Amino acid sequence: MRYARIMGVTGVAILWTAFAAGAADLPGCTAPAGFQDYPHPAIAPMDQLVSHTEEVVIGRPLVAVAEAMDKPLKETIRQSQALPGVSGDFMLTKGDFGPAGSRHIVCLTDGGSVEEESLDRGQSGNAAWFRYIVWNYRTPKARPIAYGVGEFRTVQIDSTHTRVIWTYSFRLKDDVFPGELGALGQWLFRVGFLDREYAAMMRGVLEGYKTAAETPSRP
């Protein structure tokens, strides 16, 4: 779940605003019963995580891409036959979600939820990044997952094209199938879920941005 931004003072401001707009509290989403807010798990070295990357080149300048991204999460990550979508979120820290250290509960359409924290965001020249961690999964699809680390990197490659790169890395639970099988379990998780159902969700989100940015607005 999440988005990156870039380019000049105006472009960066719009992009960070777009990100925050998707994270405002929405009706009906609250912390789950018995929820206790603990610090996020320590992040393991990359060779202990299972990762997948998707990217898209959008034929529009950064500002137009930022405007296309300016919508709530529930309109970005929709329910599919394989995975739940987002139904809303609930802030755990003051202010909007986005600055490093901000946290919220993300509610899912299957009645479950996850906790998400911003780890880092920034911009330099024509590039920007946003990194975050997701844990406290309360959804059947995520039973084998201890936590996930996502990262968006956005680069304006010329005056009319912007590349968005999204990487998701998961740490599996050591005592639950398939993580209990070690390297074999990571492979099974990759080929059976990450490179299929989850990759399809990631592509759908990125293609949604591309379509929205490249479709002329009606007067």
Residue positions per predicted region:
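A short, structured loop/turn motif at beta-sheet edges
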Residues: 59-63, 119-128, 153-163, 214-216
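Glycine-rich portal/gate segments that line the openings of hydrophobic small-molecule binding cavities
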Residues: 74-77, 87-149, 204-219
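Beta-strand/loop substructures that line and gate deep hydrophobic ligand-binding cavities in soluble
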Residues: 137-196
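Bacterial N-terminal signal peptides that target proteins for export
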Residues: 1-9
